[in-house]
Amino acid sequence: MAFPTGKRIVFTGGSGKAGRYVIPELLKRGHSVLNLDLVPFPDPSTNIMTLKTDLTKSGEVFNALTTHFNFAGYENALVPQPPDAVIHFGAYARNMLVPDNECFQANVTATYNVIEAACKLGVKKIIIASSETVYEVCFGQGDLEYTSFPLDEDMDVNPMDSYAISKLCGERVARGFARRFDVDIYSLRIGNVIEPHEYATDFPSYISNPKTRKRNAWSYIDARDLGQICDLCVQRDGLGFQIFNATNDTITARFPTRQFLEHWCPDTPVTRQMGMWEAPLSNAKIKDVLGFREEHDWRKYYNPDQ
């Protein structure tokens, strides 16, 4: 497959669960990447340079966005330039890693700092990681019901936990800066990220105990397919501020979607005809607008009937 000319991308949080798969996918598609993180990239064979950066410190972020991607940058006369795109995944990944106030302030501050620095340095493409948790149920208090199915980007959302609220605040910062600076900022509401080995280790319990997957709306995103999504976002210009659900196509269940939801969420309205196996956290927009086509359907890796 031939890919378009690669871009220079600064990626924050690339050493985390998602980034360690997304960055190699970006490299395969011809991009060059600088990783901003507090720990090195876990795969030395990629030759990805990690610049240790505290994203909650505005000065460090501004400086990191005007840094050579590797030592080869010193070999020509061109001083460090801002990147073509910034992909911001760096954050506390969920609640209960640190106290709630720290999770909120760090995530919001980091997102603000990255967006502000990128916009003021003239970067025209910014992609930020939001979360499925904004749909309220994942870390909501008690056994909550979803508002309706499918879950899509136009729904009014009102999460109650610090992590999800921090992600919603990040979306609002992105919307405002996209308008002020006339740039593209795409916010990805990322589903439950699945690494390749987790199909064998985790999917047996996911399928046999459906109630445990309610918090994820019985949906997921393969970490490698998330890399494809990031590439599509980098390549597609001119959309301004956008929110995209970043999920794979199908429900993680033995039974077709409508039958499954009627059993597990009988009181939740279904607002349109859904595909036979369509994931409740809908990726229809990202397929229609960006052309996403999943490569890693979960049934390739785990047969629920065996």
Q: How should each PLM-predicted stretch be described?
A:
Residues 2-3, 7-29:
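N-terminal Rossmann NAD(P)H-binding glycine-rich loop of SDR-like oxidoreductase domains
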Residues 42, 55-106:
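NAD(P)H-binding glycine-rich loop region in Rossmannoid oxidoreductase-like domains
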Residues 105, 140-182:
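Catalytic helix-loop patch of NAD(P)-dependent Rossmann-fold dehydrogenases
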Residues 113-160:
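Conserved Rossmann-fold NAD(P)-dependent oxidoreductase catalytic core, especially the SDR/UDP-sugar
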Residues 130, 171-196:
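Conserved beta-loop-beta element that borders a ligand/cofactor-binding pocket
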Residues 153-158, 187-221:
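A conserved pocket-lining segment of Rossmann-fold NAD(P)-dependent short-chain dehydrogenase/reductase
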Residues 180-184, 195-208, 232-243:
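Glycine/proline-rich active-site loop of Rossmann-fold NAD(P)-dependent oxidoreductases
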Residues 224-306:
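C-terminal substrate-binding subdomain of Rossmann-fold SDR/epimerase-dehydratase oxidoreductases
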